[in-house]
């Protein structure tokens, strides 16, 4: 199941950040390896994204993250 959300913050130096889900306003962890794009994988604060959610040992994690409208 796919969800939509907004990038809350993302550190290109550390390679991770958080996305706020539209439906629940919950924050979901995102790692750069889960971003679906060519080249350097990074996100910008405020970007709209679509993603899947899996349960990780530390909580929910975004997978197959796709930037919308680009």
From Swiss-Prot:
Gene3D superfamilies the record matches: Nucleic acid-binding proteins
Protein name: Cold shock-like protein
Domain CSD: 5-65
Gene Ontology molecular function, alphabetical: DNA binding; nucleic acid binding
Pfam family, one: CSD
GO biological process, one term: regulation of gene expression
Record keywords: Activator, Cytoplasm, DNA-binding, Transcription, Transcription regulation
Top-level taxon of origin: Bacteria
SUPFAM superfamilies, alphabetized: Nucleic acid-binding proteins
Lineage summary: Bacteria, Pseudomonadati, Aquificota, Aquificia, Aquificales
Compartments it resides in: Cytoplasm
Keyword Transcription belongs to the record: yes
Coiled-coil region list: none
Cellular component GO terms, alphabetical: cytoplasm
Main localization category: cytoplasm
Gene symbol of the encoding locus: csp
């Amino acid at each position: 199941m796919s969800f939509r959300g907004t990038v809350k913050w993302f550190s290109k130096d550390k390679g991770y950040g958080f996305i706020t889900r539209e439906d629940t306003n919950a924050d979901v962890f995102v790692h750069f390896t889960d971003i679906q794009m060519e080249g350097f994988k990074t996100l910008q604060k405020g970007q709209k994204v679509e993603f899947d959610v899996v349960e990780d040992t530390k909580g929910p994690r975004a997978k197959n993250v796709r930037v919308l409208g680009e």
